[in-house]
Amino acid sequence: ADLILAFVGEEAILSGEAHCLANLNLQGAQSGLLHRLSETGKPLVTVVMAGRPLTIGREVNISDALLYAFHPGTMGGPALANLLFGKVVPSGKLPVTFPKETGQIPIYYNHTSTGRPASGSEKNIFTIPVGAEQTSLGNTSFYLDAGKDPLFPFGYGLSYTTFAYSNLQLSSTQYTRNEVIIITFDLTNTGRTDGTEIAQLYFRDLAASVTRPVKELAAFERIHLKAGETRHIRMELPV
């Protein structure tokens, strides 16, 4: 075989109301099977079918490519075949956040700010000396063994091509209530394959009268570009 195409995940009956799991790893012998397949030396393409984000960091590391199909329905077969054989270029973005470990849950991109926001410079369990005294590490909102970042954030998704953003501009730097902020930028397909990018506009209010999320999705636009094509994009953000 030129490559290995492995389908893993969960049955649909495991998803839905009152179908919670305490362990979000791949169930049964699936993870072990993938590791054995990766040891063959053949390129490993993993397709995950599940109704929830699973903790698949180890499987991502041993796979040459991974497609998260969720539960695609009765026409999922032809759709997956078109994606895997390159008839269609992937353009989907994650509608949820994928944790590194189950213990990171709840984890989501639009959480509100805390009194101890993570800075990214915190210590972790691997940098604490053996026999260290019991004292404060100065940590904030942080997991000693998993950090603050997810495995894959909300809005993440790859393609068979690549895109570059440039020349970001705002219509003004000062606004009043009920005005509209105009955001413009250039989007370029820098790869050799035609593809579709979903441009996402996020914002954060640093001086609100009430606590606001650290990041909020305000708008998105689906843009198809031929290989090498550049397009000037305009997005609007009501104040």
Regions found by a protein language model. Give the residues of each.
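Loop/turn elements at helix/coil->beta-strand transitions in domains of secreted/extracellular proteins
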Residues: 1-4, 40-45, 62-64, 90-92
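Redox-cofactor binding/interface segments in oxidoreductases and associated redox assembly factors
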Residues: 6-7, 68
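Glycine/threonine-rich flexible loop motifs
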Residues: 8-27
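Short acidic/His/Gly/Ser-rich catalytic and metal-binding motifs that mark active-site loops
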Residues: 12-17, 54-57, 210-211
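Extended, hydrophobic alpha-helical segments in both membrane/secreted and soluble proteins
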Residues: 29-34, 44-46, 66, 80
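Secreted, periplasmic, or luminal enzymes acting at the cell surface/secretory milieu
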Residues: 49-196, 202, 227
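Short acidic, flexible loop segments centered on an aromatic residue
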Residues: 192-209, 215-217
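Intrinsically disordered, low-complexity Pro/Gly/Ser/Thr-rich segments with frequent PxxP/GP/PP motifs
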Residues: 209-239
